[in-house]
């Protein structure tokens, strides 16, 4: 067996990011052949990924990245098994690399991103392959749970990441006064993160979900002994309250409990003689 030098071990570590002892073992197993050692470590990572496939990956980070012109943004959730790994530079660096890759390749979804190739730092592997290699590197199951992309060609895009990177929101606003709307968009990104709406307006809430809620309220009212002739009115009252909880424009504004988000939008339009409309938003909370 050829002598394994510290220089070779360091070179392999710099190439793969795997620990020194694992790199030394890989070189010993492959007779000091650097390329074979890299392949050995990749296969070992894939084997570990398969072994840990049933593990629960419920920790991790939510990562957001926007283009320089702030017209396009991506948000993703990358999971691992423990908070210790989630806070490490290797994991967070990988999450940021995935966000950069998603943005530069105009990825629309997780499936799009999984097939894109990373650079030399990650062995020119696809994201799907790199997730397995990174499992071998950090010793935990890694999973790209979800990813989304928003654009705001006719307006402004803003984001909010809560400290700890476990909650984030991305929002797109259509407006003819984008510069003036920056602060508004930031406030609304925080609103989405804090209040967890599911749609921009009540018209966007699915009929299936509305009917499900109405049936729940109907059964509740009957169980409470309410008279049949009053049940429909009670159901509509509770449904309106539900809309106020889950529809962005009908929520109470987090910075002023006496104002609805719709009122904030109206005030902005009057003050700035501008048009403004929430186009879309995405909210990711770790594990949710």
Curated annotation (Swiss-Prot):
It comes from the Bacteria. Pfam families: EF_TS. Keywords: Cytoplasm, Elongation factor, Protein biosynthesis. One of its GO terms (molecular function) is translation elongation factor activity. CDD domains: UBA_EF-Ts. Its main location: cytoplasm. SUPFAM superfamilies: Elongation factor Ts (EF-Ts), dimerisation domain, UBA-like. GO terms for cellular component: cytoplasm. Residues 82-85 are annotated as: Involved in Mg(2+) ion dislocation from EF-Tu. It is found in: Cytoplasm. Belongs to the EF-Ts family. Associates with the EF-Tu.GDP complex and induces the exchange of GDP to GTP. It remains bound to the aminoacyl-tRNA.EF-Tu.GTP complex up to the GTP hydrolysis stage on the ribosome. This is Elongation factor Ts. It comes from Chlorobaculum tepidum (strain ATCC 49652 / DSM 12025 / NBRC 103806 / TLS). The lineage of its organism: Bacteria, Pseudomonadati, Chlorobiota, Chlorobiia, Chlorobiales.
């Amino acid at each position: 067996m050829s002598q394994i030098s510290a220089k070779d071990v360091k070179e392999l570590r710099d190439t793969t990011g795997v620990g020194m002892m694992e790199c030394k073992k890989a070189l010993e197993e492959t007779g000091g052949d650097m390329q074979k050692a890299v392949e050995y470590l990749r296969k070992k990572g894939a084997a570990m990924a398969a072994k840990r496939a049933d593990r629960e990956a419920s920790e991790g980070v939510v990562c957001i990245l926007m283009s320089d012109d702030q017209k396009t943004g991506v948000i993703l959730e990358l999971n691992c098994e423990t908070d210790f790994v989630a806070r490490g530079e290797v994991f967070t660096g990988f999450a940021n690399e995935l966000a950069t890759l998603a943005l530069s390749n105009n990825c629309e979804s997780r499936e799009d991103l999984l097939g894109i190739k990373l650079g030399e730092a990650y062995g020119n592997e696809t994201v799907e392959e790199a997730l397995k290699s990174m499992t071998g590197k950090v010793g935990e199951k890694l999973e790209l749970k979800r990813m989304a992309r928003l654009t705001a060609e006719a307006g402004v895009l803003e984001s909010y990441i809560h400290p700890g990177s476990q909650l984030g929101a991305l929002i797109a606003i259509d407006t003819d006064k984008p510069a003036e709307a920056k602060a508004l968009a930031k406030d609304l990104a925080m609103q989405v993160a804090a209040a967890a709406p599911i749609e921009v307006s009540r018209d966007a809430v699915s009929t299936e979900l509305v009917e499900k809620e109405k049936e729940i309220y109907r059964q509740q009212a009957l169980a409470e002994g309410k008279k049949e002739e009053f049940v429909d009115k009670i159901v509509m009252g509770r449904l309106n309250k539900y809309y106020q909880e889950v529809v962005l424009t009908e929520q109470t504004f987090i910075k002023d409990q006496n104002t609805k988000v719709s009122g904030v939008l109206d005030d902005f339009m009057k003050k700035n003689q501008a048009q403004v409309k929430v186009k879309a938003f995405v909210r990711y909370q770790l594990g949710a």
